[in-house]
């Protein structure tokens, strides 16, 4: 008997192209769904990225590549600001904690205590950092509660605070969360905090 005349084999062979077509269709559909999901996830990620960037870095730019470049520029600028302001903070800490800056062994403590209080505001990853140096006691001392009260009065959200004692002075390092640096002039905020703290001290 001629194998080509076998009806069972002929029927089986006739189904094979159809099965291959179905498999190809399923693979294409799966690939299409995966690609659609990937695009949706990318769109969500880019929307999140845009929401974190100050307007000046993405204004007038629609392409995703422009937004990525804007994010790179923002990160570089922020790193530069953090580096510069961290150097200023370290210099301030050295001035406060350096015993050679004090005059005379008997008057050293008094000299350190007589230094005026100071406030420094600098950007950090989640927003900005407020570093406050104050006398540890006395009428001119700035308790942490008073500093936090002034920050809350400016509508700022404090996420953490750290207190350290250096040469009979208190140093507060406070982290404040913000959504965008465009909403804040850090130099203005620093001066405003100083004014409010000094004013609150004169009232007490």
From Swiss-Prot:
Stretches assigned to the bHLH domain: 26-78
A biological-process GO annotation: regulation of transcription by RNA polymerase II
A GO term, aspect molecular function: DNA-binding transcription factor activity
Endpoints of the signal sequence: none
Superkingdom, natural source: Eukaryota
Taxonomy of the source species: Eukaryota, Viridiplantae, Streptophyta, Embryophyta, Tracheophyta
Gene Ontology cellular component terms for the protein in this record: nucleus
Compartments where located: Nucleus
InterPro entries in the cross-refs: bHLH_dom, HLH_DNA-bd_sf, MASH1/Ascl1a-like
Name of the protein: Transcription factor bHLH120
Subunit structure: Homodimer.
Chain spans, region Disordered: 1-27, 93-116
Gene: BHLH120
